[in-house]
Amino acid sequence: MAVDSSMELLFLDTFKHPSAEQSSHIDVVRFPCVVYINEVRVIPPGVRAHSGLPDNRAYGETSPHTFQLDLFFNNVSKPSAPVFDRLGSLEYDENTSIIFRPNSKVNTDGLVLRGWYNCLTLAIYGSVDRVISHDRDSPPPPPPPPPPPQPQPTLKRNLKHADGEKEDQFNGSPPRPQPRGPRTPPGPPPPDDDEDDPMSLPVSGDKEEDVPHREDYFEPISPDRNSVPQEGQYSDEGEVEEEPQEEGEDDEDDVDVEEEEDEDEDDCHTVDSIPDDEEEDEEEEGEEDEEGEGDDGYEQISSDEDGIADLERETFKYPNFDVEYTPEDLASVPPMTYDPYDRELAPLLYFSCPYKTTFEIEISRMKDQGPDKENSGAVEASVKLTELLDLYQEDRGAKWVTALEEIPSLIIKGLSYLQLKNTEQDSLGQLVDWTMQALNLQVAFRQPIALNVRQLKAGTKLVTSLAECGAPGVTELLQAGVINVLFDLLFADHVSSSLKLNAFKALDSVISMTEGMEAFLRSTQNEKSGYQRLLELILLDQTVRVVTAGSAILQKCHFYEILSEIKRLGDHIAEKTSAVPNHSEPDQDTDAVLERANPDYENEVEASMDMDLLESSIISEGEIEKLTNLLEEVFHVMETAPHTMTQPPVKSFPTIARITGPPERDDPYPVLFRYLHSHHFLELVTLLLSIPITSAHQGVLQATKDVLKFLAQSQKGLLFFMSEYEATNLLIRALCHLYDQDEEEGLQSDGADDAFALWLQDSTQTLQCITELFSHFQRCTASEETDHSDLLGTLHNLYLITFNPVGRSAVGHVFSLDKNLQSLITLMEYYSKEALGDSKSKKSVAYNYACVLTLVVAQSSSGVQMLEQHAASLLKLCKADENNAKLQELGKWLEPLKNLRFEINCIPNLIEYVKQNIDNLMTAEGVGLTTALRVLCNVACPPPPVEGQQKDLKWNLAVIQLFSAEGMDTFIRVLQKLNSILTQPWRLHVNMGTTLHRVTTISMARCTLTLLKTMLTELLRGGSFEFKDMRVPSALVTLHMLLCSIPLSGRLDSDEQKIQNDIIDILLTFTQGVNEKLTISEETLANNTWSLMLKEVLSSILKVPEGFFSGLILLSELLPLPLPMQTTQVIEPHDISVALNTRKLWSMHLHVQAKLLQEIVRSFSGTTCQPIQHMLRRICVQLCDLASPTALLIMRTVLDLIVEDLQSTSEDKEKQYTSQTTRLLALLDALASHKACKLAILHLINGTIKGDERYAEIFQDLLALVRSPGDSVTRQQCVEYVTSILQSLCDQDIALILPSPSEGPASELEQLSNSLPSKELMTAICDCLLATLANSESSYNCLLTCVRTMMFLAEHDYGLFHLKSSLRKNSSALHSLLKRVVSTFSKDTGELASASLDFMRQILNADAMGCCGDDSGLMEVEGAHPPRTMSLNAAELKQLLQSKEESPESLFLELEKLVLEHSKDDDSLESLLDNVIGLKQMLESSGEPLPLSDQDVEPVLSAPESLQNLFNNRTAYVLADVMDDQLKSMWFTPFQAEEIDTDLDLVKVDLIELSEKCCSDFDLHSELERSFLSEPSSPGRSKTTKGFKLGKHKHETFITSSGKSEYIEPAKRAHVVPPPRGRGRGGFGQGIRPHDIFRQRKQNTSRPPSMHVDDFVAAESKEVVPQDGIPPPKRPLKVSQKISSRGGFSGNRGGRGAFHSQNRFFTPPASKGNYSRREGTRGSSWSAQNTPRGNYNESRGGQSNFNRGPLPPLRPLSSTGYRPSPRDRASRGRGGLGPSWASTNSGSGGSRGKFVSGGSGRGRHVRSFTR
């Protein structure tokens, strides 16, 4: 570094602390860059300090006359040192000693001064380090508290001077990371040549002139006198007010300053040994926080490298950075405090590797200790083992068998010691010989009875022990042929089951080593493999225990083989990708791909590299699918391993349930980790995540994350990551890289999965810190320095991780595992012992860190199992240190655990505690409630059931205890109280408060819901009880509204999603409480639990406007999904009948509430609020799909609304079409595209049913409307909706019963009769369509929809016959159409031209029917749709296209020219050109035009079946060969925020008049007072809802028994939706207020931060704070988890939620032709679609998409199962590109289906507001 040799004045200023009493003061000097300090001078009073200063600043003011000044400096050469170095002391005397010179030049960026002065004028001389040349990659984490305290410049760039408050008011709370300011290059001021100065300093003239400017340059470091008067002291009181203390309530403890100074004197330069006094730490925290409020542009005293690294760091953003600790904390949000990319995992300390055996661990421990360290236990064991081996060289009698039984206990310590000490002696070989002899049946037969069995059992146990010796032991056993010997024993006659179980245990331990497994699976030519022999054994007649034990071994073999196959595929991918440049080997590959995340790379380069990779990678789609399945299987096997892979205890019996029995079996995971390790699993996963082709595949990505998440849930899994630390570092980089990519692309991906990368990183880092703590305790003795710098560094890192919610949950999770919390408790106990005799502990920074971290764990971790072992010691610590605020708060959290054992009999005490504290819910006093509920969950709620698991009946006992302790009533009251607290802030759109407030709310809600779910499931499962306490559904509906309606981010995060799932599950338990054995009457139906629950939910929807949306979501979540289910395998008839019966039961119970349902449809039908429109459509479709009565009920209601609307105008006037008509028709249109709704409409408009004649009339009115569209916009809209409805009605694929190929043409006619309008209607519809074509006023969209509809009809004789009849009546229609196409042709209207020509080709002849415009080839049509027999010939078509003025040929010629002209710019028009030329030639060669023949025979359709029959025989599932993303997608399109209609109806309203009329008795003043100033009352038992005579009754009042319990109602979800894959769960996409565009806009990150609209709202209403006085910070971005499936068959239900992002859906391939075909699965109108944005303008969004597309091949099936047929027919798109009135560029981009939702890819619609 270049150092300027001239000495300059670096700093000159006066620090004042006016105070009555004299005390020690601390001040800090900061430099904007690194300086070299040569000299420090204290300027005595009255002496001029510098000639270049104005008089008011030029003179010294130091007082008193003498004092000692201690100086400390920040050593920039030790950037991560947690403390300041000591510079030295000056014994100041104004007459003799004013100059201090350090022993050597010191380079630093700051000084700390401490001394007993009231006023100090200080000059610092030295030189500036001109070059900053550090280029470290990663900055050190901010250091933990330094000993010398250091106030800093605050808000107004002034250093507040401390006043005379006693400084011993500080307590060592950990510091907060400081905000960094920009660095400025230094420009040092010159020194002044004052006559007082004994040294003459070089001064140059030009520098002298520079004085003012340069003095200014350093000015910010000293107090700025102009901005703030000198009196703005840096006082202790000030600090207490300004400083956001850690968690808000740190008590300040006494500090003995003198003692601390003495110690400082003793040890001037040792960083570590200066006791880290509380005050410094607390002060620093204060300064940092104040700095956060107003940074002066310079960073805190710290290493100069940090600034550089900060700039590099800014590219990384946490997905949701909310640092919300306590009220004061909000003032100081730390910047990038803890860069996770900065820290990598290091080799594992303290803990042992999870896949090593006890023997291997013992050997490595002995090696580490060294051979000289005596280990008495090992020596004794080795001596005894040697004696036994020597004693019985030959003897094989009873004593030898006894020796065999003793040996296993000596192997771990004894054999390990022998192998290390005495390498010559082959003890292992001798033991293997003995083992083989012990297992030898011949030797056993020679033993007396009983001894022979003992010998064989001892032999098997010895195998198990020797297999534990790792590779050497297993290798020797295998060479001795142990597998064959064990099989001999298993296959031998008359061997008891218990002996076979022992043999299996031995075999299991052999294959638990990879060498053993390899040998077991290997077969030679002349003998079978162990696997084959084991299968043969199981297939013999064996007892159930033996089969169970054998199956466990088979499962292990399967797992091993799956891993081998994954490794093979991974190696294959690695080889293939290495062909790409820079990808020569897997590791390089990983790095190269990770590198590419660097924004410096050009996008083109990235794209081309990816393409290279894709092209060169020969991994097929099939192999990727296989890889996905293998990874999913790995996850499944690991999840079920404890129940399927362990050897059963000898004394247990595999029953379905158990009450008591042996404790849980062995732990299977070490073996699985060994297999994973030997197959380099983490390296393979990293490779998969680093290669575009696999990392972009949702299946692979999701399956990988599932496995990694599962591993990270347990201590052993995390240790596995740590033991493979190099692979884990790369893996986390790869995961974070994927997340970063999505951030760059603006993808709205699933928050939970994004956060998973960070969560995994934080979890492993936390565990690493814990290992460092434990190993520190191992190394250090009690006498060593307590606040060791390493220890503080570790604790500080842990503390920094807790600053973001993901990190906080990770810390809580890891500390709650195993005995990890002991690391903090050890620290706290050590200091509290010290505290007995002295005050060190209260000053110890480490102690305070430990207290804070323990408190964070208690608050955020729901894993309370660890509290069982630690609660007593923690409570003791809290009692011991009553001055520590953190510990006192912890004491409140742990209050319910006093003298508590986590057993079933603690339930009454805990419930009693909850009852007593219910009024303190969500207050500081009531935090123990959360813990009590968590413990209750732990004790009383069974874990989710896993396949193969025995049911433990202790959970039933726990539920009985809950009921007897009045648990039901208590939990309902908890929910009611929680609702009353949350309602007010929610109404004002205040979020949930700080992190702590939010964690508490979520935790309390989840625990209470879990407990209620457990109790109700157990109670209602058999149908023998009814539960009529309607407080439960009522409280749940409110809770759902408060926590799960619409978050600001537009989607639920994982916690909210789980709460929603729990609420749905609890409400669904009410459907179980129906006893099928009882006779069902209207009365019993209306009063059973199911109906009462439904009534509560339905009535809540319309109760208050704030509950509209939430109520609709809730209802949609409860209803079954529409059929058919999509699946890859045939569903059993029994399951199908369950699915249909469930829907009938729902229909019956809903029919009782018909009035409510009609009211809901009527109320919302006219809404302009799009999310509510969307939800209403969704619910109507679900209701119609249940059964015919509900379908008719809903469709009647909708049609009645249309009838009322159209008939409301008086007779003589022309009908007025309003926007309300438009909305009603839009609703009908959306519903008509769904099978059940369409058939109900057809049923009603036929007019055959008495009383429904009005619907037939209104249908005719609608047809008349289409014929005369008129020119008003509203009327045009209505016409377009009606044509779209006609299209749905004429589509024979929208049908309940899908045709099966095996049933032939007869079934085709039936299909048509059941899915198309009757003859009379069809005639009217065809006439209407042709009249529309002939009408010159028809809009472009109408024409396109009509042509498409005619194409549907032309597919079969029935439709074509009616079309021909209409063409005879309206012969000019096709000519008008062609003329219109030619006259308006442009690139944008190409779609209409293409469709029209396709239609003409289609009707020309039967064999050309399959031809499509985009490929102009003939297509064979197979299966369900028989060839059409009827057609037109070319001459007839020519006649139809002719007019007096011009011939068809001339029109085609003109069209050809136009297309040719446009196709130069647009290649996509080429196929249209071919079409035009082909038709022109056909017509030219056809000869003279002929009139249409009327010889056709009218096809007669059979009478349609009744609606009820159609529902009974409907297709229940659709088969697909691959469960692709389209099938996995949610059944309904997510609502898109982009579809907001800007022309919403505006209605004039006089609000004052309205309020006087409706709310005359409303007292606004008192209401506001009640809302803002009063506490919500507790829902005690005295306040009951009207209608419930609760009084003092318990919940039993509402439980009645019908005495029969055999029947178990299958009324759960009877539909299967596989667990969705993919990253998104997605959002309704809009904020709380649906049409508030400002709210929907994300904050713009491309400009300096401005306030978001919700921040303004929050600012206006900031008096409203959550109950414990914590002001709401900025709402964190949400994290979320993938939704679990909602299938009834899988037994696993998740919510599908109303918030789904686009990426659930498979994006259909772009159309090759001029317009897309109908994409998706034929016959399934639930497949959704994503079309690229930007090509078209669609304003009628939010409805279901049901485009169809290329279809999988057929298979013969029963009538209930349907496999789609490949009819790539003519264009099947739905309607136009959106109504013409809304579309500026109608026609561009091709029709993308009927209701195209905006947004392509995953949730990219966000961009419309941000870019």
From Swiss-Prot:
Compositionally biased spans, kind Polar residues: 224-233, 1722-1747
Annotated Pro residues bias: 139-152, 174-190
One Pfam family of this chain: VIR_N
Swiss-Prot/TrEMBL GO biological process terms: mRNA processing; RNA splicing
Subcellular location field: Nucleus speckle; Nucleus, Nucleoplasm; Cytoplasm
Ranges of biased composition (kind: Gly residues): 1688-1697, 1787-1801
Ranges annotated as biased composition (Basic residues): 1802-1811
UniProt keyword list: Acetylation, Cytoplasm, Developmental protein, Methylation, mRNA processing, mRNA splicing, Nucleus, Phosphoprotein
Regions annotated as coiled coil: none
GO cellular component terms, A-Z: cytoplasm; cytosol; nuclear speck; nucleoplasm; nucleus; RNA N6-methyladenosine methyltransferase complex
In-chain residues carrying the UniProt-annotated modification Phosphoserine: S133, S138, S173, S222, S1578
UniProt modified residues of type Asymmetric dimethylarginine: R1740, R1772, R1774, R1792
Chain intervals for the UniProt region annotation (Disordered): 132-302, 1615-1634, 1662-1811
UniProt feature, compositional bias: Acidic residues: 234-267, 274-302
Biased composition (Basic and acidic residues): 160-169
Subunit structure comment from the entry: Component of the WMM complex, a N6-methyltransferase complex composed of a catalytic subcomplex, named MAC, and of an associated subcomplex, named MACOM. The MAC subcomplex is composed of METTL3 and METTL14. The MACOM subcomplex is composed of WTAP, ZC3H13, CBLL1/HAKAI, VIRMA, and, in some cases of RBM15 (RBM15 or RBM15B). Interacts with WTAP. Also a component of a MACOM-like complex, named WTAP complex, composed of WTAP, ZC3H13, CBLL1, VIRMA, RBM15, BCLAF1 and THRAP3. Interacts with NUDT21 and CPSF6.
Family, per entry: Belongs to the vir family.
Name of the protein in its database record: Protein virilizer homolog
Organism expressing this protein natively: Mus musculus
